[in-house]
Swiss-Prot record:
Keywords noted in UniProt: DNA damage, DNA repair, DNA-binding, Glycosidase, Hydrolase, Lyase, Metal-binding, Multifunctional enzyme, Zinc, Zinc-finger
Requisite cofactors: Zn(2+)
Membrane-spanning segments: none
Active site: P2, E3, K57, R260
SMART domains: Fapy_DNA_glyco (SM00898), H2TH (SM01232)
Assembly: Monomer.
GO MF annotation terms: 8-oxo-7,8-dihydroguanine DNA N-glycosylase activity; class I DNA-(apurinic or apyrimidinic site) endonuclease activity; damaged DNA binding; zinc ion binding
Name recorded for this polypeptide: Formamidopyrimidine-DNA glycosylase
Residue numbers binding DNA: H90, R109, K151
The organism of origin for this protein: Shewanella baltica (strain OS195)
Catalyzed reactions: Hydrolysis of DNA containing ring-opened 7-methylguanine residues, releasing 2,6-diamino-4-hydroxy-5-(N-methyl)formamidopyrimidine; 2'-deoxyribonucleotide-(2'-deoxyribose 5'-phosphate)-2'-deoxyribonucleotide-DNA = a 3'-end 2'-deoxyribonucleotide-(2,3-dehydro-2,3-deoxyribose 5'-phosphate)-DNA + a 5'-end 5'-phospho-2'-deoxyribonucleoside-DNA + H(+)
Documented EC number(s): 3.2.2.23, 4.2.99.18
Gene field: mutM
Length: 271
């Protein structure tokens, strides 16, 4: 599943081709995504795209009439292509621009979404209760400590809770906890401020590095120009259960936590 770095890389890739361009058509070939795609042709045709933003794992394509809210789901991708590019399987939506290009949404598993919002996006049900962005100053040790106070849940589950901090999915939660030396099952409310300070710093550093490297190379992810990301070559624990720890040489443990595969080093990461 594309996580925050992959979505940000996509935003950076498509934004230069969309901003200040006029929409001349919206082609919906298959509107049966995670939620039905609304018929917004009348609202969006003739509109100028003002900016392309990201909130958590959602891409926001702003016009004066409203905002398209796009989620890549498990396997979705967005590509900038010439308008006459042949349609392939799973090419569900084309946003057609006056400059002869299209923004094409492809999603084999159809867990993605393309929605429309005419209200300030902060009021949309999908966005209204989201926590702070991890790469902003709003995500800091004071905020995290307050959010975790009294919580008995495993720290990894809290780190992946979008009400606490957005966009830290399974890959980067595994990696950040390893870098911070914190066991993923550690009780969140009992982690001291010093360790939380390290964790916040590692989350920021790992996400920023992943964005710089172009996102994580996984089976379904390619960035906006069709090229794979490169960060997977640098993963220390994710998907490496049973292999040796890159720090101490111990065999990495693999468990299920919150129905997600979790990999950690029982020596380097403590409760």
């Amino acid at each position: 599943m594309p996580e925050l770095p992959e979505v940000e890389v996509t935003r950076q890739g498509i934004a230069p081709f969309l901003v200040e361009q006029t929409v001349v058509d919206l082609v919906i070939r298959n509107g049966s995504l995670r939620w039905p795609v609304p018929d917004i042709a009348k609202q969006i045709i003739g509109q100028v795209i003002r900016q392309v933003r990201r909130r958590a794992k959602y891409l926001l394509i702003d016009t004066d009439a409203g905002t398209s809210i796009v989620h890549l789901g498990m396997s979705g991708s967005l590509r900038i292509l010439p308008h006459d590019t042949p349609v392939e399987k799973h090419d569900h939506i084309d946003l057609v621009l006056a400059n002869g290009r299209i923004l094409r949404f492809n999603d084999p598993r159809r867990f993605g979404a393309w929605l429309w919002c005419e209200l300030p996006e902060e009021a949309h049900p999908l966005l209204a209760k989201l926590g702070p962005e991890p790469l902003t100053n709003a995500f800091n040790v004071t905020q995290l400590a307050a959010a975790l106070a009294g919580k008995k849940k495993a720290i990894k589950l809290c780190l992946m809770d979008n009400h606490i901090v957005v966009g830290v999915g399974n890959i980067y939660a595994n990696e950040a906890l390893f870098a911070a030396g914190i066991h993923p099952e550690a009780e969140a409310g009992k982690i001291d401020i010093e360790r939380l300070t390290v964790l916040v710093a590692e989350v920021k550093q790992i996400l920023a590095h992943a964005i710089k490297q172009g996102g994580t190379t996984l089976k379904d992810f390619t960035n906006a120009d069709g090229k794979p990301g490169y960060f997977a070559q640098k993963l220390h624990v994710y998907s490496r259960g049973g292999e040796t720890c890159t720090s101490c040489g111990n065999l990495l443990s693999e468990i299920r936590l919150g129905q997600r595969t979790t990999v950690f080093c029982g020596i380097c990461q403590t409760r």
